[in-house]
Amino acid sequence: MEISQGAEESLEIMGDPNVISSITATVTDRTLVISSKEDLPANSSLSYKLTVKNLTGVLLNEFGVIKIPTCTTDSLELTVNGPGRMDLGEIKVTDLKFVVNGNGSIEADSVTSTKLTVTSIDTGAVTIRGGSTVDLILELGPGFFLGADFKSTNVTLNMNGSGSAQVWSVEKLDATVNGAGKVIYFGEPTMSMSISGGGQLSGGGNK
């Protein structure tokens, strides 16, 4: 599925007509729900193009890939449950939330925000290749956060388990690591840390 913003809202479904006939799309309380009346064949291939005026949240359950090339809005929450993946392009959101439950992933080329909250308490992964935020808040388990080139003014990190994180903090880093997790930070922030259970916190140099 590819999601874009536009003046007119629309949903286009492409694929085998016999498979499309089992797909339902309903709107309840301003939430679009796309589901299937029955189990789809393993070899079925469907693609979706969704255009919305204002995007405030996306929930991906189980398998699948959702692409959002660009998005500009005040508040947005993106959630992946299971092994699915979200591929993001240039995202400009004041208050942004990423939630990964399971072994899914969220990957972004660029994020610009005032506040970004990332929650990934399972084995999922979040990757941000560029952009900046004022406040980055991370709640991590055994998964991964890769943001060495994502500039954050302040970083608050709470890691429980054997996860791995790379962060770039300019002013302040508040890190708590419980377990065998590993954190690499870039920049020269003022630091407050609590490490137990064999965890590691090390500097990767200034940027």
Name each model feature, range by range.
Residues 132, 137-170:
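Glycine/small-residue-rich hydrophobic helix-like segments
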Residues 56, 64, 84, 104, ...:
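Residues at the loop-to-beta-strand transition
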